[in-house]
Structure formats: structure tokens, C-alpha cells
């Protein structure tokens, strides 16, 4: 798929609750991403932040990973196929290397926030 042919309403990212607390593990779907690159970056940062929320001082990478699978949230870009970002490709790196604040800042890419900022102007 190409960024030139975004679905109506833009690309959508599905947030999945790994703890099983939500129906079908789906917490929410966030729409309105103008490009696939933005949707992928949002999904990546969202998962990165979720991993960091599971990191407790003194825990090993294995313990962080176990905590994420038990309590974390995953994200996927809907209908992006092979072009969509997948947490499995970077999860090992995420648990091995703590993230800085910019790598976790999914809110800066959230189209819901961007829409709110536009209304304030």
C-alpha cells in the first residue's frame, strides 16, 4: 500500500490490551493518520511507551518482556499489510534498551490531539 492511497478517513491504529481485559483485546482504534508513515511512527512510539511503563528499576530485559506481555499494550496499523509496523520486529531491542522521552512521545503524533490544537488557533 502507498501513502498516496490512504483509506477513507486516514490510516487507523488499533490498540490491543495484552492483559486480556478488553473484548477481543481491543482497547480502541485511533483514526485520522494522513500517511502510513505517521501511523507506523505512532504505533511504534505507543508500544515503546507501554514497554517503558512495564520497566521497573532493577528488572532484567526478560522480566520487562514478561511484564509487557502480561500488562502492556500493543499497537497495529489496520489494513497496512506488510508495510505496517509490527512490535515483534523491535520488541527485543525495546526491552534491552530503555527509551528516551522522544521515543515514547506518541501523543505528539496523535491525530486527536492535532485536531484539538487546530481548534485552539
Spans of features found by a protein language model:
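Short aromatic-glycine-(Arg/Gly/Cys) micro-motifs in beta-strand/loop hairpins
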Residues: 2-29
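Glycine-rich loops and low-complexity Gly/Arg-rich segments
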Residues: 37-42, 54-58
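Classical N-terminal secretory signal peptides
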Residues: 1-2, 121
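A short, exposed loop/beta-hairpin motif centered on an aromatic-Gly-Thr core
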Residues: 24-41
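Compact, well-ordered interaction domains used in eukaryotic information-processing assemblies
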Residues: 32, 46-49
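Short, mixed-charge low-complexity intrinsically disordered segments
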Residues: 48-121
Amino acid at each position: 500500500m502507498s501513502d498516496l492511497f490512504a483509506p477513507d478517513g486516514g490510516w487507523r491504529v488499533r490498540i490491543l490490551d495484552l492483559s486480556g481485559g478488553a473484548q477481543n483485546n481491543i482497547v480502541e482504534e485511533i483514526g485520522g493518520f494522513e500517511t502510513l508513515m505517521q501511523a507506523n511512527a505512532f504505533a511504534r512510539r505507543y508500544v515503546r511507551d507501554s514497554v517503558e511503563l512495564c520497566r521497573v528499576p532493577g528488572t532484567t530485559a526478560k522480566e520487562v518482556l514478561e511484564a509487557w506481555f502480561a500488562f502492556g499494550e500493543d499497537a497495529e496499523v489496520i489494513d497496512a499489510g506488510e508495510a505496517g509496523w509490527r512490535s515483534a520486529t523491535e520488541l527485543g531491542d525495546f526491552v534491552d534498551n530503555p527509551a528516551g522521552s522522544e521515543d515514547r512521545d506518541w501523543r505528539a503524533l496523535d491525530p486527536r490531539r492535532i485536531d484539538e490544537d487546530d481548534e485552539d488557533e
